[in-house]
Amino acid sequence: NNLLGKRTKENGYLQADAYLGGKVVKEYGGGICQVSSALYYCALLSELQIDERENHTFRVGYMPLSYDATVSWGGPDLKITNDRAYPIRIEASMADKELKVSIVGTDNGKYVKLSYTSGYAYMNPEYPDVATGILSEATRWVYDSTTDALRSCSDFPSAAFPESAQMDAAMCPTKQMPTDFNMIII
């Protein structure tokens, strides 16, 4: 948030759709979460430390479940730390309404695959068969580039439903190891 500044007309932001109070509204800087989500996704792939991240209240159309990151002035923020022994460079560009974000650094002898699981939340006792939300969890699988041995596995949970509901791991299907990887371009 501090890097991008307050999203106002005076700071050069245009109005676009944004989520506010459970509704879609026009807001200066609306759509900025596409940038934070792309950066979050790249940080996951780069095995960077995720210090702070919140998903949207609603499912977004530009990223798979668990890979979005909402930001709002005075509210949720995305904070990542370069916990590597070397510097990184974040590159971002926009062409033909396509956002491209990359994190460039030194090869550390590892590669990353991402996967996610998802399931529906059934939280209303009056209507036990009606889904009231979506639970999902991204998993970062880190492998050794030389041996293909699994080095680590980290989970990043998400939930898109009323705040009163709590995430319950029993509601999500069993996590599966990824078999392939697809690049996401926003």
Locations of regions flagged by a protein language model:
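Well-ordered beta-sheet/strand-loop patches within structured domains
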Residues: 1-186
